[in-house]
Amino acid sequence: MENNKKILESSKKLSSYGDGESRFSFLEKILAPLFLALTAIYFVMLIFPIISMIRYSGGSHIIQTLYDQDNIKTIILSFVTSLIALIFTFIIGTPTAFCINFVRNKVLSKILDIFVEIPVVLPPAVAGIALLLAFGKNGVVGNFLSNHGINVIFTSTAVIIAQFFVSSALYVRVLRDSVKSVPIELFEVSYVLGAGKIETIIKIMIPMLKKSIVSGLILAWIRSLGEFGATLMFAGNIIGKTRTIPLQIYTYMQDDIKMATAFATILYIMTFVLLLLVRLSIRDDD
């Protein structure tokens, strides 16, 4: 209702501009080409560096990259750790997104939203330091684990934790926004029919929002695959153990830029394909 009122008010304002039609027509002739030019500049700035990278890497180097044993280990490690992080993201992030929406206290709800947003905007190095201090031997969690003979830092587990920390928020945000768009009447009808909140979520909401769930998970997976700073600070750069694709690119940049760009091209292609799946999923949902 509020959106409809805003649309009507905007329409009235536009209709009141009839006297200045010639003035706005003149401005449109100037601004329309300017907008197109700025849009073209924006996409050139986005696309040209990527084209340059692909041209520089060359097809032979990309193929050579895929035959290197260390690179194969890196790719396998990246996929395994990111998929495990994705499973935890779904298991933990799904109820979290619903619980945030069910919080009645607006202040508490906003505070929880801020905590969800922080990993998205936090510099990766800061996230790495925070995880290092929390899970280190002197940290609260790390000290407890150390007393039980469990070491997390500089292990594959640390990679999974870092990937989960930086990527899960994307999934929670997508699902939270989708839940907010569901009419409140749907919940009320479900309650009247005798279903509880959990039953409503499992039997009605999750099947209804499956496209949003898939899209959010793919976005989180992309973020996990591209995670660099927090992983480097928290898990290190150990081949076959903690060296993911971004860390392998970082390592190659020190002495073999051709291989670095070839690996970067592979990561770009993977990201593009996954984002394309997200777009197709959203289009099908619409």
From Swiss-Prot:
Q: PROSITE patterns attached here? A: ABC_TM1
Name the record gives this protein: Probable transport system permease protein NifC
Question: Which positions carry the signal peptide feature in this UniProt record?
Answer: none
Membrane topology annotation = Multi-pass membrane protein
- Residues that span the membrane, as ranges: 34-54, 75-95, 114-134, 152-172, 216-236, 257-277
Write down a Pfam family by its short name: BPD_transp_1
Q: What is its main location?
A: membrane
Which NCBIfam families does the record cross-reference, listed alphabetically? Mo_ABC_porter, modB_ABC
> Gene3D superfamilies, alphabetically?
MetI-like (1.10.3720.10)
Task: Give the location in the cell.
Answer: Cell membrane
GO BP annotations of the record are: nitrogen fixation
Native species:
Clostridium pasteurianum
Its annotated function is as follows:
May be involved in molybdenum transport.
- Keywords attached to this entry: Cell membrane, Membrane, Molybdenum, Nitrogen fixation, Transmembrane, Transmembrane helix, Transport
